[in-house]
Design a protein with these regions (language model features):
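N-terminal auxiliary segments of SAM/dcSAM-dependent transferases
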Residues: 1-7
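Class I SAM-dependent methyltransferase Rossmann-like catalytic core
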Residues: 7-48
Length: 222
């Protein structure tokens, strides 16, 4: 695992002016992600310039909206549980209130009834059982922030590596690395880093992998 300072990533975002570096984000409240991790995700997206994005864990749709607003040409897929797929599901105890909130917000997700909704495809189901075969080798950016239990984390990670584009620059980003509610995540990603070059942004909850980006990886390690 490579632990890097935030500027290492932000310096990879090349722009002709500060105006081009501007982004729009939803100001956080108690339900939405902190701005720092959102800025990291948007920087990763600016680096790889995704045509397609897949999000594990829609939650209330704020991060989905952040991505849609800042990348107007990008198609976004977002997956989360519905009432049917929740039946009999074994979740991490800390995920249960998040799922309850997600289901409560079904008709109030952040991107609904906005100009960006038409570029967002909502998918429903348990990601451990979902058939991702139709999305293989099609996603340029994958954001893993769904079920945090070890089984789901491993399943989502393996499916992410199947979905990531093989012929283009791509990125897989994991959220909640360092979240005290999920102490097993650093250990899991640490073991994964034995076979994959992973980067953790210090002072954040984000770890990422870059695909077909040897030059960028070298800069991050320098």
């Amino acid at each position: 695992m490579h632990n890097i300072r935030p500027h290492k990533l932000f310096n990879l975002v090349h722009s002709a002016s500060y105006l081009e570096r501007m982004v729009q984000v939803v100001l956080p409240d108690k339900e939405s992600p902190v701005v720092f991790d959102t800025a990291i995700l948007l920087a990763l997206a600016k680096v790889v310039r995704p045509r397609t994005i897949f999000e594990f864990g829609t939650y209330i749709g704020v991060q989905t909206l952040n991505l849609a607003v800042n990348f107007p040409e990008t198609k976004i897929y977002t997956l989360d549980l519905d009432e049917a797929s929740l039946q009999g599901l074994q979740q991490d105890p800390s995920d249960k209130p998040l799922t309850e909130r997600h289901l409560k917000y079904q008709t109030q997700l952040a991107f609904l009834n906005t100009p960006y909704e038409k570029r967002i495809t909502r998918l429903y189901g348990d990601s451990n059982k979902y058939d991702f075969s139709g999305l293989a080798n099609q996603m340029d950016l994958i954001y893993i922030d769904g079920g945090h239990d070890p089984v789901t984390l491993d399943s989502d990670t393996k499916n992410a590596f199947k979905m990531i584009s093989q012929g283009n620059a791509g990125c897989i980003a994991w959220h909640d690395h360092g979240n005290p509610l999920y102490p097993h995540i650093p250990e899991y990603l640490g073991k994964l880093s034995d076979s994959r070059q992973l980067f953790h942004i210090e002072e954040s909850w984000t770890t990422f992998f870059l695909q077909n980006s040897e030059g960028l990886v070298a800069l991050l390690k320098s």
